[in-house]
Amino acid sequence: MDFKNAQLWRTLLDEYNSSAAQEIRVMEVCGTHTHAIARYALRTLLPEGVTLISGPGCPVCVSGALFIEKIRHLLRQGVTVTLFGDLLRIPGTSGTLMGERNLRIVYSPADALHFALENPGVKTVFAAVGFAPTLAAAAALMAEVEELRPRNFSILSDFKEIMPVLQLLCREEKLSGLLLPGHVASITGLRHFRGLGIPGVISGFEPENILHSLHILLKAHHAGKKDLLVNNYPDAVRDEGNIQAQKLIDRYFSPENGTWRGLGNIPQSRYTLKEPYAAFDTEKIFDLSQVQALENPACRCGEVLTGKLQPESCPLFGTVCTPEEPAGACMASPEGSCAASFKFREGN
């Protein structure tokens, strides 16, 4: 807890001490928030009766085993798959992708296209995961793809839309408030998160900004302001969001049903390329309909992602599941709740 005013924030937050019978449950839905909360031990500053739980905010974690097995199937067909490095460690039904041939790690969607352009004889797929910021980058990339029309490049999309999942969690889980993702909101805008029925605050990522956001949420909860929505990250987020990025997304992508780890199939929660761009849609080029996958029944990552289970309560945590040898996605990705809890747990 190496930041100023920690004791001041403890005092301010303690004004909203709650009895066990009136537990206040706040969910953070951003992997960067999860990491910061664990790093700075912010949970230790919360008053009695207030619980901060992690939600489905890690983009790599929420992609299920089926997505990994689709990548593996493409590799078996001699396709080169470009992907973000975190995906290498996410377990599928047949284990992780570590050691597989024809994989290329990229750091942006643009890197994937550049590889394809430099290797015109190589069938290249970009295994795409992420929320609105990465989706916006991919949409900008598609403008270049539309112009150049490379015949060896396609996108296997598992881009996610967070709102349908938040709506589901707000209906089914006993949540008192949401710490909303600043990076996503920089694209979608504040207004994208209206109508959830519980208080929400868009937050930045510094510890004091997170604590201030939590203070706003607790104050709103005690005042009964269920529809409160506050932008506490005004340097990066506007009410209308990034209009240019939204237009690009709408031009190239459309939402459809998508599978989320721990939540199953959620309507309108996965973005895929629109029909006019089917020539660059991996699932329209290659037959992946027969690919099947099973999640590891011992891994409880799905419960962690939906706030039903704290990482330390999983029987695999820290024993057979560690960052060096992860049994599940939440431990494999640095943005995962389990990985953050393990790295910054007491004694480490």
Which residues fall in each region the model found?
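Internal helical hairpin/lid segments
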Residues: H212-E303
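Short, conserved secondary-structure transition motifs
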Residues: F159-Q167, G241-Q244
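Pore-lining transmembrane helices
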Residues: A137-M142, A245
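A general structural motif
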Residues: I105-Y107, F159-M163, G182-T188
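A conserved active-site cap/scaffold subdomain adjacent to cofactor or substrate pockets
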Residues: L156, C170-A236
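Metallocofactor- and cofactor-centric catalytic cores in central/energy metabolism, strongly enriched
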Residues: M1-G121, L135, A143-E147, S154-L156, ...
